[in-house]
Amino acid sequence: ISLAGTEASGTGNMKLMINGAITLGTLDGANVEIHEQVGDDNIIIFGMNVDEVNACKSGYKPMDIYNSNAVVKQAIDTLQYGINGQQFNEIADSLKNSDPYMALKDFDSYQKAQAYASECYKDQTKWQKMSLANIAGAGIFSADRSVEDYARDIWGCLLYTSPSPRD
């Protein structure tokens, strides 16, 4: 899951969308475009937006979050001290000391979004409506539309329409 402002765009979530998946993600990359198509009610966004990320970068101290958030501390300590005999010190140290993707900063928002996703899933009518809204909104990502846009906007080509068989 990318930090807002760090992902150019990806197609994986578009493939999921066209099959009815509901996106749970940051407002970054293709998620911005998906959000524009399906609206606030049919995508689950968490975390900071680009402006908030930029404002936070200069004074961000992930260790402050580690020290003040018991859930974050427990998760990182589990990485540090091991899971089933495996230690993940490099990941734990990166999160505590630099956290370049500001995962700790977005953590509380992610937890709330995950809880909301679970609530939505329990209401099957709501979940199905969200799913159908994603399928219906996915047409903008079709290859036909993309090729037509490239042909017109980049290559300056006119759209070819074949004559009717009756002509």
Question: Where are the model-predicted features located?
Answer:
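Conserved small/polar residues in nucleotide/adenosyl-binding loops
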Residues: Y160-D167
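Catalytic binding pocket for nucleotide-activated donors in carbohydrate/polymer assembly enzymes
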Residues: I1-S131, I135-I140, R145, D149-R152, ...
